[in-house]
Each structure stands twice: as C-alpha cells, then as structure tokens.
C-alpha cells in the first residue's frame, strides 16, 4: 500500500490532498455562510409576496447557472484547455482562451438581453399563478430583469475559475462563491431600508455578487498570464470544439436538474410540508456531498485532463484510484453517521418556532433515505471526470438519461408506501446506480484499472465504520432528549457526539494499520 501511494506522489503533480483540503474548507465556509444568509433574509423579509417574487426571480438565473456555468462549461472547456496547455504552448493557449471567452460573452449577452426583454413571458411560464395578482407579477418581472445579468457575470467567473483550476490555483475559485452570500447579507442588513420595496435590495445584491465573484479572480488570472481581452472567431477549431462539446454537456447536466424538478412535482401532490421536509434534508445532504464530492471533482478534472493529454495512462489510473479511495474513506462513514444522527441533526438545527417536532420527524425520514445514496452521489463526482477528461461527454449523458428514467420508476414504486421519504430514497438509489454504470463503463472501455489492495482497504473501512456506529449509538443512548435546551446547548451536544464518532473511526483505522500519511505523501 505504501509503495502504491509513494508512486502516486512521486510525480510532478501537486499535493492533491492539500488542494482538496483547501477547496473543501472554502466550500464549507460558503455553505455555512449560505445558511447564515438564509436565516438573515428570513428574519428581515419573512415569508410573503415580496420574498415569493424574489425567489422565483432568482430561481431561473440560478438554474441556468447550475446547468451552464458550474457543470456543462467546465466539462467541455477544461479538457481542451489542458490539452492546449500541455501541447500548444502559452501563446496558443492565450489565443484559445480569448476566442472561447469572446464566444461565451457574445452568447450570454444575447441570452441576458433576451431574458430581460422577455421577463413577463418568462414569469408566465415559470410561475403562471403569479399572473392572477398584478402587483406580484409586476414585482417579479422587475426583480427578474435586475437578476438576469447574473447569468453573464457568473458564467464569466466560472470561465476564469476553470482556467485557474487548470493552473492548480484551486482555492481562489473555491472562495469566489462566498461573495454572493456576503453581498446578499450586506444588502439585506444595510441597504434594504433605502429601496422601495426593500426586496429590490436582494435582487441588486445578486448582480453585485456576480460582479464581485468575477473581479476577485481577475488579478490571479493576470498572474498566470491568461488575462486576455475576449475576441470573436467563429472559425477557430479549438473554440468550435468547445462549442460542440457543450451540447451533450448541457444535456447531461440538465438531466439531473430535470430529475429534481420532477421530484418536486411528485412532492407537490403529497401532504402539505413535503417539499419543505425534502428541502431541509437536502440542505443537510449538501454538506458532505458538496464539500467532498464537488471538491474532488474540481481538482480531479484538470489533473486527469493533463494526464490524458500527455498520454500518461498509468498516472491517470493512479489519480482515479486515489480519488476513489479517498471517496470511500470519507463518504462511507459520513453516510452511516448521517443516517444515525438524522434526529439530532434535524432537531438541533431546525426544530424551533413554527418548525414543529412533527416537521423534524418528517425531515429526519427524508434524511435517512438520502443517506442511503450519499456515497453514490460523491463517487459520481470522481467517476464522471474520468470521461470528461477524455473529452467523452456522451457516455455520462447516456447513463444520466437511464438514471433519470429509473429514478421516476422508483418514485412510482416508493411514493405510495414511503411518501416523501420514498422520493428521497429514489434519488439516493439512482445515484448509486449512476455510479455503478459509470464504473462499469470505465472498466469495460479499459479506461481505468484499480490498483491492488482494495479488498483489505475496504475491510478496514467497514470494520472502522461499525466501531464508529457502535460508539455513536452508545453516546446517543446517554444523551438527554434533543428537543431540550437552547439552540447553543443542542449544537454543543451534537458537536460532542460528532467528535466522538470521528475519534472512534480514525482510532479503529489506526489500530488496523491504516496510516493517513499514505494519502498525503508529497514530492520532495
């Protein structure tokens, strides 16, 4: 085992674990700040016509951001950028970046202007019920026109971030999303009284947040010599390759968003509160899946792309294997702990005021169901870049479509007996299916060969997770009822339980001969 990891780190690659820690910590900070933002917005604006209008107005730019900026573009752009960096030289890479940024700016400027002009019709499609209330409809239209430029700004910020990631500057793009939260918190606390109606402050905060995310990264882009003026050339082969890859990439990312929308439609037919219970459970799920899964995918895509571009298949396999082992090392205990601690988590974080014990219990059910698929959600973030880095987007797209169909079949099977928890379970099981099919294709196409030692590695993990689970159940047994005490007291108790579980897990690993330094070996 030690020889294997020595080979991994005796390369010219940077210490990926250090990069993972940096990206994960930045993502964690952004998620925590996001929770604070939600709490502040809820406290200042409450829940009513104005906030309904804002969330609808923000939903479309946010959806397009998820589809375009954070998923499809990176999948299409990063592997080709890595190829240019590896084979074409700095000047050719600068020209390539200029042409891609020019086409991106042109396309998104058209989309932004069209969206602002067509705002009333967009609202008619996305929130037809608002048309019955003239004031609400007018406010939503106004808010949408203010927030729509965010699509252009965040997409350009994502372009800059993708370039920085390819140059191994991972922490800078990872920190950028915090500026949106900071902007919204600042505008909500200090600027809202100066707007009429006050909710307009939130819309402007979104656009300002987009500007900050872009501007923050530009000095770092200049440092690596890639700050260029956008240029338009419809005949450049490199830029056109990115455009051609964008089609299937957008389809692939859209499939997951479509699945979430369909699940919301299913939930809307269930008891009142079902959508909210799933939302809060999903927010808890996003911590491990976002912090670990997104961070791993972020650092692996450019690293794998470089290995593929240089023709180093052995290094490519070692990187994939390293990512998968780290995935299982952290995701397996996270999934088990999330299921065991579902009640303490939901009660400690949410059961206050109008959020009743019944609401917490229903959220708990959804969270347990989600936890079944946590490892699948995270493993997909490691396996999918294995295809994207080879400029093969079609295979993951085909698998995503199969997964979407299976998700809906499972929804129909589970929604009757399990209600909203059945919908959560469908998402979790579908993620595991997605991961399994991706792995099968990687092996079938002889893209990835696992390194030796997996059986003993998994045995140690399973034994350690069982020890952790026993400790968690033991500590929970002696804890008083979680609904007792203030929020601070509940969170302190929850923290103590989590620390006990973490200590038990890594202590068991140490007894079984596992050494964390196997993952952190560096070049000299």
From Swiss-Prot:
GO terms for cellular component: plasma membrane. One of its GO terms (molecular function) is lipid-linked peptidoglycan transporter activity. It holds the Pfam family MurJ. One of its GO terms (biological process) is regulation of cell shape. InterPro entries: Lipid_II_flippase_MurJ/MviN, MurJ. Pathway: Cell wall biogenesis; peptidoglycan biosynthesis. Keywords: Cell inner membrane, Cell membrane, Cell shape, Cell wall biogenesis/degradation, Membrane, Peptidoglycan synthesis, Transmembrane, Transmembrane helix, Transport. Belongs to the MurJ/MviN family. HAMAP family: MurJ_MviN (MF_02078). Involved in peptidoglycan biosynthesis. Transports lipid-linked peptidoglycan precursors from the inner to the outer leaflet of the cytoplasmic membrane. This is Probable lipid II flippase MurJ.
């Amino acid at each position: 085992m030690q020889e294997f990891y020595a080979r991994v780190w005796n390369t010219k690659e940077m210490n990926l674990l250090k990069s993972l820690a940096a990206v994960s910590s930045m993502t964690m900070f952004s998620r925590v700040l996001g929770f604070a933002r939600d709490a502040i917005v809820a406290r200042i604006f409450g829940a009513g016509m104005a906030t309904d209008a804002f969330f609808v107005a923000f939903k479309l730019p946010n959806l397009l951001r998820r589809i375009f900026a954070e998923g499809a573009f990176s999948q299409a752009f990063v592997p080709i950028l890595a190829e240019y960096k590896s084979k074409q030289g700095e000047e050719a890479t600068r020209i390539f970046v200029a042409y891609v940024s020019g086409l991106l700016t042109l396309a998104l400027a058209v989309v932004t202007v069209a969206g602002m002009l067509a705002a009333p019709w967009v609202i008619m499609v996305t929130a037809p019920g608002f048309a019955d209330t003239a004031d609400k409809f007018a406010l939503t239209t106004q808010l949408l026109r203010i927030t729509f430029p965010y699509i252009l700004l965040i997409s350009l910020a994502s372009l800059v971030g993708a370039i920085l990631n390819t140059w191994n500057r991972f922490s800078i793009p990872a920190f950028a999303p915090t500026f949106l939260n900071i902007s919204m918190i600042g505008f909500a606390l200090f600027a809202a009284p100066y707007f009429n109606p006050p909710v307009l402050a939130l819309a402007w905060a979104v656009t300002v947040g987009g500007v900050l995310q872009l501007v923050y990264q530009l000095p770092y882009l200049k440092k690596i010599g890639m700050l260029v003026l956008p240029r338009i050339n419809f005949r450049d082969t490199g830029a056109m390759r990115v455009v051609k890859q964008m089609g299937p990439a957008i389809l692939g990312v859209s499939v997951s968003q479509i699945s979430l929308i369909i699940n919301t439609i299913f939930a809307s037919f269930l008891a009142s509160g079902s959508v909210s219970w799933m939302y809060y459970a999903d927010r808890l799920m996003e911590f491990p899946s976002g912090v670990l899964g997104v961070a791993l995918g972020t650092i692996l895509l450019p690293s794998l792309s470089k290995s593929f571009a240089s023709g180093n298949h052995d290094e490519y396999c070692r990187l994939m294997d390293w990512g998968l082992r780290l995935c299982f090392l952290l995701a397996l205990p996270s999934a088990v702990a999330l299921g065991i601690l579902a009640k303490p988590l939901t009660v400690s974080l949410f059961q206050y005021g109008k959020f009743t014990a019944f609401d917490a219990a229903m959220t708990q059910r959804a969270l347990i169901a989600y936890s079944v698929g946590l490892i699948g959600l995270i493993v997909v973030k490691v396996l999918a870049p294995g295809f994207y880095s080879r400029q093969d987007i079609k295979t993951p797209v085909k698998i995503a479509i199969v997964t979407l169909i299976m998700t809906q079949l499972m929804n129909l099977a589970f929604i009757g007996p399990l209600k909203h928890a059945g919908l959560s379970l469908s998402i979790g099981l579908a993620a595991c299916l997605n991961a399994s099919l991706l792995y099968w294709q990687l092996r079938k196409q002889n893209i990835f060969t696992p390194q030796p030692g997996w059986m003993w590695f998994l045995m140690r993990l399973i034994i350690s997770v069982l020890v952790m689970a026993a400790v968690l159940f033991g500590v929970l047994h002696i804890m008083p009822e979680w609904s007792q005490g203030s929020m601070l007291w509940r969170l302190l108790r929850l923290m103590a339980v989590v620390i006990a579980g973490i200590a038990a897990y890594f202590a068991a690993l140490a007894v079984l001969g596992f050494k964390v330094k196997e993952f952190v070996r560096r070049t000299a």
